[in-house]
């Protein structure tokens, strides 16, 4: 029980820490969908995904380097 305050404090710090995302990315504690370059638009899930940085809504994840780019920069354009 001595460690309970330490665990609570650690979880609080992790939950409120500022997340550094890359260009054209934003942090979401509940991402639902991320488009990938070269894929056709697909329906988004209605449940939360793993909290992470994901591409802004108008951007696509480019494979293999993982950058978020505009649709016109995708390979099929």
Curated annotation (Swiss-Prot):
Site feature: Reactive bond: 46-47
Q: Does the keyword Cytoplasm apply?
A: no
Localization, UniProt: Secreted
Keywords attached to this Swiss-Prot or TrEMBL record, sorted alphabetically, are: Disulfide bond, Protease inhibitor, Secreted, Serine protease inhibitor, Signal
Signal peptide annotation: 1-17
Q: List the disulfide bonds.
A: 21-53, 30-48, 33-44, 55-68
Chief subcellular location:
secreted
Give the protein's function: Defends the organism against the host's proteinases.
Protein name as annotated? Serine protease inhibitor 3
- What organism is the protein native to? Anisakis simplex (Herring worm)
């Amino acid at each position: 029980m001595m460690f309970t305050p330490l665990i609570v404090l650690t979880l609080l710090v992790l939950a409120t820490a500022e997340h550094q995302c890359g260009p054209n990315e934003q942090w979401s504690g509940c991402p639902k969908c991320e488009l990938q370059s070269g894929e056709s638009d697909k329906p988004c899930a209605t449940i939360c995904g793993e909290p992470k940085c994901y591409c802004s809504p108008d951007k696509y994840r480019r494979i293999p380097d993982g950058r978020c780019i505009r649709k016109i920069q995708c390979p099929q354009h």
